[in-house]
């Protein structure tokens, strides 16, 4: 059947290949060239690559049109090649910049190869490392407050919420073409203000960093003192937290999360080692416990446990940056990243929460690692490793937080005017009307090279006294070997014709002026004519730049590097002469108008002080230091980790993890790929999680200030 269909397709004119692998195939009657003939495929491929330098995006894989042929099809082609005594390419030649499919690479090579930027492993580990640490250490305490059965049910529910919302954000960021959480929310629902989302991300990031530092202050001094590495380390908790900034600060100033991809594996390894130690110690501790195991324990602390479990899966501020850096972000790869990250977190959280609760029953502390004996050296090694993972968790959270802070500052403080920049000693910058000679614009699937052509002598000013001859000679040499776009050539002809008409009119007017009395009036008319001519030249130059930027890709000769300098010098001379010959009244009016606008702008933004503050805050190092300082001061005075985690999970995690993804889902991919009933049901479920999380935050606040909702100690024991 397959061979018959294949032969029929060859008779029609070529081999039918999948859409993502389709290449130009010769007809069946044309035999492939022999070994003596020159290889035409390479020349055709090179010409094709030169004409279209960018590859179109591949369609999503499906069962009907896979990216690569199946094994049966490959075997049939190999048999046919052997019988016909000729060799046909099974796959199309891989162009430069493309990578082989992972399906053809053995899993051993993929598993133990270095982690590349934007790979599946790097994305999964970065997502998992973003939430491992502070949340997982409070899960045994949350399991104690709710009971074993309810705690496991909450873990399963929050795992699904984490997976589904991560997939929503990553797929929607590709759908809307956005790279930040705030931009994605604003594009999905324009009613959502971008500043509010950025502010939520900033506050959530600072709170998460606070929880990391609180746990670090509990772990690091105790482990160093019990391992006899630093005697009396518990008395120097503040000094150790300040010393950790030496490692946290350099990692936090990195502009991208992919810079930390080689460190993202360490928190996972540290937690795996801690899990193995918890399992080993639980074999002895379970036999010593006599308290009953509670399967269901409903009280007011249920809401605190709900938020603790929710915060344990909080990774969503890093989803959009990771999706932006993901290589080949197709739907299957996005699905794999979301599912694998959620399953990895669930497989680590469930045994730690269960065994941590069963090992200590009703006396589990908010940081369950503090329940172990102070003489247990093995657990102190675990706490030391977890301390290092906390140190790495702060930069993973702070990098997207600083990006949102930059976006918030840019939206609050508009770009300063030229006089305000000059007041601070900054030289004003003029926008050039000429685009760069070789301007490369890179998008997801397109690399476009545009060429800006310089003026010829006819299209220039035309006067030798203004340097037109020198500029014409310079541009004449630059134009050799550069193919002019078809859209620009009619404009050049029109500009040359207009300049020739003006030169003839100028010559006729000079011949008609026979007396000296009208020479002054003639000079004034000549100045007006030259001013109009320069304005026409400037407009023509701008239209040429636009036409050249929208033209298709052209090959540029290696000797055309001086063409850009000639264009820029010609444009600068034109603007300078136009400013020199501007009437004094117009110049004074223009300067007065600029000064008035300057004073109004300074009054709105608070003057030069606000401008200087904006310049300082645009520095990433200053912004990171401004974020870490208040977080460090709060970590020095706080010691209740679960309360901090519960408040964060209620106020911010519910917004970023369920509320905003539900709105993005309903307005974006849910409106396209889901039925109305399914879409509404999922949105109601996510909004329900949001409401419970917000109500839990209120309960935690009331319990903290001893207002109400207190749980008797007899219920816990």
Swiss-Prot record:
Keyword ATP-binding belongs to the record: no
GO cellular component, one term: vacuolar membrane
Higher taxonomy: Eukaryota, Sar, Alveolata, Apicomplexa, Conoidasida
Main localization category: membrane
Record's compositionally biased regions (Basic and acidic residues): 1-10, 74-88, 497-519, 584-602
Disruption phenotype: Reduced survival of extracellular parasites. Altered morphology in bradyzoites. Increased cyst burden in chronically infected mice. Unstable inter-conversion between tachyzoites and bradyzoites.
KW Transmembrane helix (keyword) present: yes
UniProt biased composition (Low complexity): 26-53, 463-477, 547-558
Pfam family, any one: Aa_trans
Biased composition range(s): Polar residues: 16-25
Residue intervals passing through the bilayer: 124-143, 149-170, 196-216, 236-253, 265-283, 303-320, 341-358, 378-402, 622-638, 644-669, 681-702
Role description: Putative amino acid transporter. Probably transports arginine. Involved in maintaining the osmotic homeostasis of the digestive vacuole. Required for extracellular parasite survival and bradyzoite differentiation.
Top-level taxonomic group: Eukaryota
Chain positions covered by the region annotation Disordered: 1-88, 462-602
InterPro entries assigned to the protein according to its UniProt record, in alphabetical order: AA_transpt_TM
Name of the protein: Putative amino acid transporter AAT1
């Amino acid at each position: 059947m397959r061979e018959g269909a294949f032969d029929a397709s060859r008779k029609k004119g070529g081999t039918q290949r999948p859409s993502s692998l389709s290449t130009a195939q010769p007809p069946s009657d044309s035999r492939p060239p022999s070994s003596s003939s020159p290889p035409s495929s390479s020349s055709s491929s090179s010409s094709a690559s030169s004409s279209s330098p960018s590859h179109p995006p591949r369609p999503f894989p499906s069962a009907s049109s896979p990216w690569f042929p199946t094994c049966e099809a490959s075997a049939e082609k190999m048999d046919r090649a052997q019988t016909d005594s000729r060799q046909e390419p099974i796959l199309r030649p891989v162009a430069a910049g493309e990578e082989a499919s992972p399906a053809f690479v053995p899993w051993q090579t993929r598993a133990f190869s270095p982690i590349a930027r934007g790979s599946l492993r790097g994305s999964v580990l970065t997502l998992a490392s973003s939430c491992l640490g502070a949340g997982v250490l409070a899960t045994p305490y949350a399991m104690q407050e709710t009971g074993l059965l309810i705690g496991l049910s909450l873990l399963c529910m929050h795992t699904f919420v984490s997976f589904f919302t991560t997939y929503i954000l990553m797929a929607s960021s590709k759908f809307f073409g956005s790279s930040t959480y705030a931009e994605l929310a604003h594009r999905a629902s324009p009613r959502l203000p971008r500043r509010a989302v950025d502010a939520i991300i900033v506050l959530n990031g600072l709170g998460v960093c606070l929880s990391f530092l609180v746990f670090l202050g509990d772990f690091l001094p105790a482990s160093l003192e019990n391992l006899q590495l630093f005697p009396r380390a518990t008395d120097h908790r503040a000094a150790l937290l300040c010393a950790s900034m030496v490692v946290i600060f350099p990692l936090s100033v990195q502009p991208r999360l992919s810079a930390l991809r080689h460190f993202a594996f360490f928190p996972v390894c540290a937690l795996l080692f801690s899990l193995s130690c918890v399992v080993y110690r639980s074999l002895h501790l379970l036999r010593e416990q006599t308290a009953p195991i509670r399967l269901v324990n409903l009280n007011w602390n249920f809401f605190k446990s709900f938020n603790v479990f929710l915060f344990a899966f909080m990774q969503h501020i890093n989803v959009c940056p990771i999706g932006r850096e993901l290589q080949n972000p197709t739907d299957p790869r996005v699905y794999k990243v979301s599912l694998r990250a959620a399953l990895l977190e669930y497989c680590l959280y469930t045994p730690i929460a269960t065994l941590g609760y069963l090992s200590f029953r009703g006396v589990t502390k908010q940081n369950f690692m503090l329940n172990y004996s102070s003489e247990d050296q093995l657990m102190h090694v675990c706490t030391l490793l977890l301390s290092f993972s906390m140190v790495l968790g702060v930069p993973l959270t702070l990098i997207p937080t600083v990006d949102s802070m930059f976006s918030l500052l840019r939206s609050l403080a508009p770009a300063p005017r030229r006089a305000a920049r000059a007041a601070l000693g900054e030289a004003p910058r003029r926008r050039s009307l000429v685009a760069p000679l070789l301007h490369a614009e890179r998008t997801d699937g397109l690399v476009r090279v545009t060429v800006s052509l310089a003026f010829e002598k006819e299209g220039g000013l035309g006067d030798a006294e203004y340097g037109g001859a020198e500029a014409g000679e310079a541009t004449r040499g630059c134009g050799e070997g550069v193919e002019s776009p078809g859209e620009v050539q009619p404009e050049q002809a029109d500009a040359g014709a207009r300049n020739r008409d003006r030169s003839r009119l100028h010559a006729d007017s000079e011949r008609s002026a026979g007396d000296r009395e009208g020479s002054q009036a003639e000079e004034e008319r000549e100045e007006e004519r030259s001013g109009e001519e320069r304005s026409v030249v400037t407009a023509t130059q701008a239209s040429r730049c636009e036409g050249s930027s929208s033209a298709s890709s052209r090959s540029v000769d290696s000797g055309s590097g001086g063409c850009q300098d000639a264009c820029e010098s010609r444009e600068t001379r034109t603007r300078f002469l136009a400013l020199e010959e501007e009437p004094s009244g117009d110049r004074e009016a223009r300067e007065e108008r600029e000064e008035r606008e300057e004073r109004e702008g300074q009054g709105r933004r608070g003057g030069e002080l606000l401008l200087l503050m904006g310049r300082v805050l645009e520095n990433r190092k200053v912004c990171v230091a401004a974020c870490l300082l208040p977080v460090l001061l709060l970590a020095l005075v706080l010691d209740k980790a679960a309360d901090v985690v519960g408040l964060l999970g209620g106020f911010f995690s519910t917004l970023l993890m369920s509320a905003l993804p539900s709105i993005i889902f309903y307005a974006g991919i849910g409106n396209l790929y889901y039925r109305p009933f399914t879409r509404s049901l999922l949105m109601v479920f996510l909004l329900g999680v949001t409401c419970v999380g917000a109500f839990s935050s209120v309960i935690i606040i009331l319990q903290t200030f001893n207002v109400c909702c207190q749980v008797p100690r007899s219920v816990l024991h």
